[in-house]
């Protein structure tokens, strides 16, 4: 299969890229700094590197890079620095998701293209009316005011929910909401749930990349 990954130079994106290549898939990555990828990945015969900031690509370039891909994965996130949290682009994840989905629609491929968005348990699924305590609602309301990356994550998922929806004839999407991400030396077991089973604020779990 053919995959396109944005955010491939990040901690999660690197591992996703490595695992897809190890399984024999063909992978394209859009990265600003290819040197951040492990040498074994950079030199892999099945890897195509597009050196660019994803939002700097033209619509035509974006459509060309998406063309022929069975799936697109966004592992984008904001650096945990003052500039990364409060500088531009503030809507990195949302704008990348929107433009990648528009590129898929532009190509009008015969089959469905899968879109995987790495999101966060701090974002609730409004389609499922997930419950939150009054304290949690107050804290998340405050986060929306002071943390632009939190708003970006919410709006990216909302774009998929509201603009792409469940019945799009070209895109099948999922927003993956891991708990606090950690690094383990080996691949560990994991479980999937439609909604968080613990509070993302109080007593949240850990997810190994």
Predicted regions and their residues:
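N-terminal Rossmann-fold cofactor-binding loop
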Residues: 30-35
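Conserved Rossmann-fold NAD(P)-dependent oxidoreductase catalytic core, especially the SDR/UDP-sugar
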Residues: 26-28, 87, 98-148
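N-terminal Rossmann NAD(P)H-binding glycine-rich loop of SDR-like oxidoreductase domains
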Residues: 2-26
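Conserved catalytic-site region of short-chain dehydrogenase/reductase
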Residues: 81, 121-128, 181-184
